[in-house]
From Swiss-Prot:
It is found in: Secreted. Inhibits HIV-1 reverse transcriptase in vitro. The modification Pyrrolidone carboxylic acid is found at Q1. It comes from Bos taurus. The lineage of its organism: Eukaryota, Metazoa, Chordata, Craniata, Vertebrata. GO terms for cellular component: extracellular region. This is Lactogenin.
Length: 73
């Protein structure tokens, strides 16, 4: 698989299916590996599915659990 795809998986996929609450959002925001975190993305989405559930979606349309994150001012 390509380098960009692997980067996407690292930054946006949470295979443990956690998330959806303020603690998760704040913790994941702190753990984003950006050189200039304050100049980074103001909106982000995490996918909460394991590989088995995600694989069909990688190839075709489907539904997954996600958490949308926005930077707090």
């Amino acid at each position: 698989q390509g380098r960009m795809y692997q980067r996407f998986l690292r930054q946006h996929v949470d295979p443990d299916e956690t998330g959806g609450n303020d603690h998760y959002l704040n913790l994941s925001r702190r753990n984003i590996q950006c050189p200039n975190r304050h100049e980074g993305v103001r909106f982000n989405t995490d996918i909460h599915e394991d590989l088995t559930n995600r694989r069909p979606i990688d190839e075709h349309e489907g539904v997954v659990r996600v958490t949308d994150k926005t930077e707090e001012g």
